[in-house]
A protein has these predicted regions:
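Structural motif at the C-terminus of the N-lobe alphaC helix and the adjacent alphaC-beta4 loop
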Residues: 40-50
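ATP-binding glycine-rich loop module of kinase domains
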Residues: 2-35
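Activation segment of protein kinase catalytic domains, centered on the conserved DFG
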Residues: 83-102
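Conserved C-lobe activation region of Hanks-type protein kinase-like domains
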Residues: 184-264
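Structural motif in protein kinase domains
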Residues: 71-84
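Short beta-strand micro-motifs within the conserved protein kinase catalytic domain, predominantly
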Residues: 54-65, 73
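Activation segment/activation loop of eukaryotic-type protein kinase catalytic domains
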Residues: 133-177
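Catalytic-loop of the protein kinase fold
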Residues: 111-139
Length: 269
């Protein structure tokens, strides 16, 4: 959708294209999903923090639900793939550090929304789906390297103080990839710590890209692949290990993850 060039508040971004998101039948219950995502986008957006995506408009057409957003140049994973060999210099290190800090601050504004508390609304949010596909890269007039923005509030939630840490894991979709151990442990509960785990996974892959480019990211993703207790192959960051002599399992971070964390696995100098 091409339109006249406009200026927007969010960190000096300029848009001449927009992204239109349509909820598909697979997106749970369309109306329920639409209302939840709309409420979260009203609470948490680029007007609250520069590293959160901004909802521009919503509408329904032929019983389908639509969201209108600024058009991103790429997702974070697409950015990694396009910039295959980033420079390992001070300037790039500062940019990576700045983006990590900005993403952390954006998530903190969801976890501890002081802008809502100042309005008398008491509660705590959780994003619930942090992954490279949901981190968008935008060009910016304020930074020649662009800016990373957290998007997709479809799985996010907002809870009152009393319920912020006791949501049963049976009530959330079991997303692959970055999901934390509490998703798979019987009786596990979901809290804001869910986002902290997924942030750690994201930042580890981001640093892997900076240290070794897209090739190293692919190697790391491949190295994490293992057979899960269900028999399926996945590349999540942990595995479940049966406790000897007992009918229960404990979660452990995969050796491949701790190795790359200490730069052993691929001998990055």
């Amino acid at each position: 959708m091409k339109v006249k060039l406009i200026n927007f508040r969010q960190v000096g971004l300029k848009y001449e294209c927009f992204a239109l998101k349509m909820l598909q039948d697979r997106d749970f219950n369309d109306e329920k999903q639409f209302k939840n995502e709309l409420e979260q986008l009203k609470r948490f957006n680029g007007l609250v923090h520069d590293h959160l995506v901004t909802l521009l408009a919503t509408f329904t057409l032929d019983k389908r639900y639509y969201f209108l957003f600024p058009y991103a140049d790429s997702t974070l994973e697409q950015y990694w793939e396009s910039v295959k060999s980033p420079k390992r210099d001070l300037s790039t290190a500062q940019w990576v550090s700045k983006q990590c800090s900005g993403i952390m601050a954006a998530i903190d504004s969801i976890h501890d929304p002081k802008h809502l508390q100042n309005l008398g609304v008491r509660g705590y949010g959780r994003h619930g789906d942090i992954k490279p596909d949901n981190i968008l890269w935008f060009q910016s007039s304020k930074d020649p390297r662009g800016i990373l923005v957290v998007s997709d509030m479809g799985l996010s939630s907002f809870n009152r103080d009393t319920s912020r840490s006791n949501i049963p894991n049976t009530k959330i979709p079991k997303v692959p990839g970055y999901r934390p151990p509490e998703c798979d442990i019987e009786g596990g509960t979901i809290s804001r710590a869910y986002d902290i785990w997924t942030l750690g996974c994201l930042f580890l892959e981001l640093l892997t890209w900076w240290l070794g480019g897209w090739e190293l990211v692919e190697k790391f993703q491949e190295a994490r692949k293992s057979v899960y207790i269900t028999g399926a192959i996945n590349n999540i960051f942990f595995h479940l290990k049966k406790v000897k002599g007992r009918n229960e399992y404990v979660a452990q971070v995969k050796t491949q993850v701790t190795n790359v964390s200490s730069r052993k696995l691929f001998q990055v100098s």
